UniProtKB/Swiss-Prot annotation:
Species the sequence originates in: Mycolicibacterium smegmatis (strain ATCC 700084 / mc(2)155)
Taxonomy of the source species: Bacteria, Bacillati, Actinomycetota, Actinomycetes, Mycobacteriales
GO biological process, one term: DNA repair
Protein name (Swiss-Prot/TrEMBL): DNA ligase C2
Catalysed reactions, semicolon-separated: ATP + (deoxyribonucleotide)n-3'-hydroxyl + 5'-phospho-(deoxyribonucleotide)m = (deoxyribonucleotide)n+m + AMP + diphosphate
Function, as annotated: DNA ligase that seals nicks in double-stranded DNA during DNA replication, DNA recombination and DNA repair. Has weak intrinsic nick joining activities and accumulates DNA-adenylate. Acts as a backup for LigD in the Ku-LigD-dependent NHEJ pathway.
Length: 354
């Protein structure tokens, strides 16, 4: 490639705020894989937030880029998977498969789309030093003739419109609102944008923990569960943002609750043998968790915790939950899915327009 901006490039990031700030440009926060796309003639590369190439996993995007995008460009955006008027992140995760034959099959059966929201380069021009208002205008021109695969994200400078997006379209899979100062230059790996996301709370059972990478005397993360209507304990996610002193104190406190796997509801080895999907989810199946130790220490389900989360993806927290407080006053069996707040239904993600 011979572009003014070359891969790999870390995307510009956002920091969380509680309210949508005034006086900026606003966009929906799409729920998918962040990717910077590079096209130089017949060459196309899809980068990721971790600067790992994703090109081989989305051949349909590569093919569409050759017909829908300018001949030489670098575009920041989100790879998403539309399904039944919402975004399906679980199905999108399945696209990261090591087998080329399965990649080809999924590309045909569940094709992805690319939502473009920033421009880093066009032709011979580097746009990273230009203000966002100028980059946005150039991006609109660059995508004027785009086809069905590449889409320009809606944007507005009207605060009430941004607030409406935030409240109305969560149920379609939108992840909140992004705010960008109009004079903002493109700053890779810097948290200079702003994001506002939904926050909810849930009381969960702590049913296990993983050790911290520092050693065998500190907790790395706590595994959370909620009870089904039939009384089985379902795995819903983890919390892990603790100071080191708290990690060590938790390790000591939890030793009295350590159980064996034989009668633990999350005996993955036995369950995975009977359920290939469970084996994929907890035992691997994509390059992103290759080599990662997914083992854990089982606990009797007696410790309860209140956590903050943004939204669910299927039956699990979409992102890592955040610790709020311990709940010694609650009974474990009261920690059920019934307490969860469902987002309002949205008719379609495509209705998120100015």
């Amino acid at each position: 490639m011979d572009l003014p901006v070359l891969p790999p490039v870390s995307p510009m990031l956002s920091k969380s705020v509680n309210q949508i700030p005034p006086g900026m440009s606003y966009e929906p926060k799409w729920d998918g894989f962040r990717s910077i796309l590079f096209r130089d003639g017949a060459e196309v590369e899809l980068g990721s937030r971790k600067e790992r190439p994703m090109t081989r996993y989305f051949p349909e995007l590569v093919a569409a880029a050759l017909t829908e995008l300018p001949d030489r460009c670098v575009i920041d955006g989100e790879i998403v998977l539309p399904a039944d008027n919402h975004l399906d992140f679980e199905a999108l995760q399945l696209r990261l498969h090591p087998a080329a034959s399965r990649v080809a099959m999924l590309a045909e059966q569940t094709p992805a789309a690319f939502i473009a929201f920033d421009l880093l380069a066009l032709g011979d021009d580097d746009y990273t030093g230009r203000p966002f208002s100028e980059r946005r205008a150039a991006l609109e021109t660059a995508l004027a003739d785009a086809g069905p695969t590449f889409h320009l994200t809606p944007a507005t400078t009207d605060l009430p419109t941004a607030q409406r997006w935030f409240h109305e379209f969560e149920g379609a899979g939108l992840d909140g609102v992004i705010a960008k100062p109009l004079d903002l230059t493109y700053q890779p790996d810097k948290r200079v944008m702003f994001k506002v996301k939904h926050q909810r709370t849930a009381d969960c059972v702590v049913a296990g923990y993983r050790l911290h990478k520092s050693g065998a005397d500190a907790v790395g993360s706590l595994l959370l569960g909620l009870y089904d209507d039939d009384g089985s304990l379902a795995s819903v996610g983890v919390i892990g943002a603790f100071p080191m002193a708290t990690r060590r104190a938790l390790f000591t406190e939890l030793q009295t609750l350590v159980a064996d796997f034989d009668h633990h509801p999350w005996n993955w080895a036995a369950q995975a043998a009977a359920d290939p999907e469970l084996a994929r989810r907890y035992g691997g199946g994509s390059r992103w968790n290759a080599g990662k130790d997914l083992s854990f220490v089982p606990l009797r389900p007696e410790r309860l915790v209140e956590v903050r989360y943004d939204h669910m993806e299927g039956r699990r927290f979409r992102h890592t939950a955040q610790f709020n407080r311990w709940r010694p006053d609650r009974d474990a069996r009261s920690c059920t899915f019934a307490q969860l707040d469902s987002p309002p239904h949205s008719s379609s993600v495509t209705s998120c327009r100015v």
